[in-house]
C-alpha cells in the first residue's frame, strides 16, 4: 500500500510487474508515475498495485503525464546499440533508443537521483562502447555524479533467484555527493520455499509427470554431451535461475511441488 507520508517520491519506467515499485515503497517511497507498454504486464501490475501503468514512454503524450518534483527516477531499460558510440557519443547520438527517452526525462525533470538497471552484458555490449556512451551522457551532458556501475546478484541479497544485473545510480549536482558505495551482500540465504504460494495452485500451472520425465531425460542427454539445456528443475531448498519474460527453454524454472502428486512441477511464482 502507498505510504501516506512518504520519505521521497519516485517514478517507475519500464515497470514490468512492479519490482522497483515494491522495493522503493518498502523503504518509504511513493510512486507518482508508472510506464509499461506490455499489456500482460499491465494486467499483473494492476493486480499488484490497483492501478494501470501509462503506455509507451517514447510517446510525448505519455511523457506529459509525468509530474514535476519527484525525487528518484527508476528505469530498467533494454540494452540497445547506438549509431555513434564511445567517448564522443553524446545525448543526440542516443536518439532513437529507449535510453534517449530516459535521459530526456532526466534532463527535463532534474530528479535528485536516478536508479537504472540493465542486463550484465551491457558492460561488454558493442565492445563496451554502449555503456561508455551512457555514462558520458549521464555524467557530462546531464551533469550527474555517477559512480562506476556495478553488477549485483539478487541471490546475495535474500532473493531466491540467480539474477545478475548491472546497476547505474546517479545524483544531482546540487546534492554535492562525491562518493557512493554499493551495498555489500547481506548473506541472507533465501530459497524458493520462502516465496512459494501457500494456497493450492490451479492445476493448469502443472505439468504431467510423464512430460516432466521426458524433460529430465532430455536434459540428462544434453548434459552427457556437454551441452546446456534450458529447463532447470528446482526443489524447495534451492534458488531459481533468473526469471525473465519470453518462451525459450533457458527461461523456464520448473519447481517440484508435492501438493498434488509426489512428482509434479509448477511454474507458479509469487508475484508472477
Labelled PLM ranges:
Residues 62-70, 80-252, 256-267:
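Class I S-adenosyl-L-methionine
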Residues 38:
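Conserved SAM/SAH-binding beta-strand->alpha-helix loop
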Residues 14-17:
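Class I SAM-dependent methyltransferase "Motif I" SAM/SAH-binding loop
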Residues 43-65:
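S-adenosyl-L-methionine
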Residues 23-30:
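A short, Lys/Arg-enriched amphipathic alpha-helix followed by its capping loop at the start of a domain
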Residues 34-35:
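The conserved SAM/SAH-binding core of class I Rossmann-like methyltransferase domains
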Residues 9-11:
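Conserved beta-strand elements of the Class I
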